[in-house]
Amino acid sequence: MARKAYPVVVDLHSHADGLHVRSAKVVCDGREIPSQADDLNGDFRADELAFTADIPAQGEAVYRITLSDTDAPRSYPRETRAYLKLHDEKGKHPEVKSITYPGDADLLDMYNSIYGHGAVFESRLAAFRIYMDNRQSIDLYGKTSYRLEMDSTGFYTTPEQLAQGYGCDILWAGQSVGAGSFRGYQNDKPCYIDTVAWRRQTILADGPVRTVVEVADGGWVY
């Protein structure tokens, strides 16, 4: 069975230990493949290299990777997007990379303080958001066109945008797990992440090839 756009992640600590990777070039059959090197722990050094590979059925594909600690990062068309924005009554919605709330923060205030109610991430196929509250439900945005849309609609598609072919929120998450979420399980029933010391959402990587969003709960009493 052929694999199309199969995700590949290279651990740079294992395969390029000691090299401060600033640029990476991935080539297959003479064609450059978009890739990205991500710093996932905030130490300003790349931890992982991500790209997608096409692998033929019952065959093989050779991808050659060149890493550099001096070249400038390579630029590729954006295929993904992730953001975390603060709610602003003036409509500016400033973008932040991480936000942490104390465990006793009011759930509704926390939920409403973020534009879109949580971290948003998308590919050209679909978009998702993770609610910043004790549910942490994942909501789904369906698309009719192969493109990035969140910077245009922000999950709140207008009638005019719908008429232009934009997608929209297609799932009522409510109290469910939505498109999937982390929950506890007590007395044969799923339960929310209620008693914590703090809650945090962080955008660890924002394209162009992949996005990485971290949802963390500190000191959960379960």
Specify the residue positions occupied by each region the protein language model found.
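Alpha-mannosidase-like glycoside hydrolase catalytic domains involved in N-glycan trimming
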Residues: 1-109, 116-118
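Short, surface-exposed beta-strand/loop "edge" segments at domain boundaries and coil↔beta transitions
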Residues: 33, 55-61, 128-129, 136-139, ...
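Short strand-coil-strand connectors
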Residues: 29, 124, 216-218
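Extended, loop-rich substrate-binding clefts of extracytoplasmic carbohydrate-active enzymes
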Residues: 162-222
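Extended interaction regions within the primary functional domain
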Residues: 93-96, 133-134, 142-155, 207, ...
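Residue-level detector of beta-strand face positions
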Residues: 25, 120, 212-214
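A structural/positional concept
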Residues: 102-104, 108-166
